[in-house]
Regions:
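Bacterial N-terminal signal peptides
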Residues: 8-19
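Carbohydrate-interacting regions of secretory-pathway proteins
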Residues: 27-36, 40-44, 49-325
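Boundary at the C-terminal end of the N-terminal hydrophobic targeting segment
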Residues: 21-27
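N-terminal leader/targeting signatures
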Residues: 6-9, 194
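N-terminal secretory signal peptides that target proteins for export/translocation
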Residues: 1-5
Length: 325
């Protein structure tokens, strides 16, 4: 993925036409509301959209632009985080308008919803203009307060077959294979997912890609650490070592293409540390939410390790995961 949006600049603007009156009887400017008007919708929301071809995940962060205005940030089923162009909560109705990124629509995405108990519920339109339902659950806290005890390391890859793994889709046939302990895809391909799921863990994985290729490692199947041919380039959250669209690496430790490289990644709650080729490039940073391409948005659940296989040629070896107890 190559669209470049700086990860932490969560900026949006609100356009609304309604005028309100404050408790002092003074009219508020258009687009503004009394303080505290949107407390029920503020925060991080894990969305599930009930698409016609099956459910898919999205993510929404609603926060204050100022006391009387809202702004929002959104992650769809693919792509990276983007800012909404309109965010409003009026008479119990939430409206979020989001610019198209990789979707096929010719008009902006529009999510309409309301608070139902401790959830959000609403509708949007799919790429063919069909109305579909969506629900939102509040995302869990970023990390655990308990000390982590580590179990025994697990070798996730054997020497000769795909035992313990499954393809996300077989529409293009079986496109992953293992030979002499090296896992390789043939393009076009699909993502590869472990049968086992994990909560907190330490991961070691070695990888190699040809020039201009692209892949990724999805932690719990939800948070992509980017793999890309980016040696010598300025750092960015969309480039090698970044948590896609959210967290840029501190430095570029990428080797040239066609060389074996190594990730050592620790994930505890939503806090992540990434070591690339022996250099710490992300240290105990909080991942705001799911990244595009995630398997689901259930951030509080254990999840698998997923290797991205639908973007380019990639090889992996020595995949070792140490789970928490």
């Amino acid at each position: 993925m190559t669209r470049h949006v700086r990860p932490v600049l969560f900026l949006a603007f609100v356009v609304a036409a309604a005028s309100y009156t404050s408790g002092a009887g003074q009219a508020l400017p258009p687009g503004e509301h009394p303080a505290g008007f949107a407390d029920a919708v503020l925060g991080r929301w894990d969305l599930t959209v009930e698409g016609v071809e099956g459910p898919y995940p999205s993510w929404l962060l609603i926060h204050m632009r100022k006391d009387t205005q809202l702004q929002a940030n959104f992650v769809g089923r693919f792509g990276s985080v983007r800012s909404a162009t309109l965010t409003d909560f009026d008479n119990g109705q939430l409206t979020v308008v989001i610019p198209v990124q990789y979707e096929q629509q010719k008009t902006d995405l529009k999510f309409i919803g309301k608070v139902v108990g401790d959830k959000l519920e609403g509708t949007t339109e799919d790429e063919k203009g069909r109305t579909v339902k969506w629900t939102g659950a509040r995302a869990p806290a970023s990390t655990t307060t308990k000390p982590v005890n580590w179990g025994a390391p697990i070798q996730l890859l054997n020497q000769g077959d795909l035992t313990g793994w499954r393809q996300r889709s077989t529409a293009k046939g079986i496109c992953w294979s293992v030979a002499d302990g090296v896992l390789t895809n043939k393009t076009p391909c699909a993502d590869l997912i472990t049968e086992k799921t994990f909560t907190d863990f330490k991961l070691h994985v070695e990888l190699m890609f040809p020039p201009k290729s692209n892949s990724g490692v999805y932690l719990r199947g939800r948070y992509e650490v980017q793999i890309q041919d980016d040696a010598g380039k300025p750092v960015d959250s969309h480039r090698m070592g970044g948590v896609y669209g959210f967290i840029a690496p501190y430095t570029n430790a990428t080797k040239p293409a066609d060389e074996w490289q190594a990730y050592d990644i620790t994930l505890i709650g939503r806090r992540v540390t990434v070591v690339l080729n022996g250099t710490t490039i992300i240290d105990n940073e909080i991942i705001p939410g799911i990244t595009g391409g995630a398997i689901d948005s259930r951030e509080g659940d254990p999840g698998p390790l997923m290797l991205q296989g639908d973007h380019g040629k990639i090889s992996f070896r020595n995949i070792t995961l140490t789970p928490s107890l």
